[in-house]
Amino acid sequence: MSLMTKLGFRALVASCLITAGSAANAQVNVLITGVGSTQFPIATANFTNEANLPQQVTSIVRADLARSGKFTNIDAGSTPVPETASVDLGAWKAKGANAFVAGSVNRDANGQYKVNFILYDTVKQQSLGGLSLTATDTTLRTAGHKIADYIYQKLLGVRGVFATRLSYVIKTGNRYQLQISDSDGQNARIALSSTEPIISPAWSPSSTKVAYVSFERKKPIVYIHDLPTGRRYMVSDQKGNNSAPAWSPDSNTLAVALSLTGNTQIYTVNANGGGLRRLTQSSSIDTEPFYSPDGRWIYFTSDRGGAPQIYRMPAQGESAGAAQRVTFTGSYNTSPRVSPDGKLLAYISRTGGGFKLYVQDLQTGAANAITNTNRDESPSFAANGQYVLYATQSGGRNVLAAVPSDGSAPPQILSVQGGSVREPSWGPFMQ
């Protein structure tokens, strides 16, 4: 959510229902709108014994690879090829595939599935190994995502993020839903449904909890939702506004923005709701905190220089060292997010009457716009730092978009039929 929206919180009457185990009716759909300049050609043969499965693992793998923008799927025909088959790698290379995947899905006596596959490098004429996974009817999609992750890492040298999850807020009519889904928008579940706004979801680094802000008690309050149990609990209900939760790397602490004493300032609170501590001591508005992955710094938005810019301070607060300005490109910058490796800063900059997603190299200070949209907000890095998820507008609708963090390909649009989707947060690698 934008800085000005966060600073203009209104008290709203709420009616809220927790539905942790409910399947989502409104589901995010992915539209592949562009690909990278260089794509890796790969052929994924149909896995054996897939005909009557509730989920086609092969289709999930192919879709993941295509969605990444890093691969092009070479037609592998309709004949299933098990991982145990003897494969003519030269023939597949001649068809234009630099890699080939074969596999099988077998159901055991307990009703579980054994998913096996092997990955070949057709150029070097060698096996790159594979996995043997156990799945159920409900986790076959996850198995497909894990296979795609394996392929991505083996061929590109970077860990894949297909088996990670997203959180976002869908608004349909007068109802808001906080949803949790797979990285492709499928398998969506409703964590919270309310007639009042839900904003600022934030994943814990442990991948088991999501913090968010709900207006259900006539004011913004910070809650934590425990995903394994479906239980949620209040973390910050201080006087005034409670907003912008951000997790520490150890998942034990949240940085929050509170208007407890008037102007919004940065505080920390234990994940159990205790131990409130003030970090900033300015007469300006300090908001939108975000921890660096090493836990040393907190980045935040402040107008202490006259207009919103990104600053950083020691994680212990300004008492341990003065805040330092980080952004110098543009006169209005908000919504800091640091990449998982600590090298990049994503933020939103007001540019030419619109708002665009920028990425800055934290070592050199070089910053560039990486999108072709101009109503951007709420950036969130993928766990491998290769992509940034953000909210924007497309065709007059509120949608999500994912773009390579180097801006090398156009955004892929994630939309919902009959509604709008905002407030994205890309989850960490699954524990």
Swiss-Prot record:
Part of the Tol-Pal system, which plays a role in outer membrane invagination during cell division and is important for maintaining outer membrane integrity. The Tol-Pal system is composed of five core proteins: the inner membrane proteins TolA, TolQ and TolR, the periplasmic protein TolB and the outer membrane protein Pal. They form a network linking the inner and outer membranes and the peptidoglycan layer. It comes from Burkholderia orbicola (strain AU 1054). Residues 1-26 form the signal peptide. The keyword Cell division applies. It comes from the Bacteria. GO terms for cellular component: periplasmic space. The keyword Cell cycle applies. Residues 406-431 are annotated as: Disordered. Its main location: periplasm. This is Tol-Pal system protein TolB.
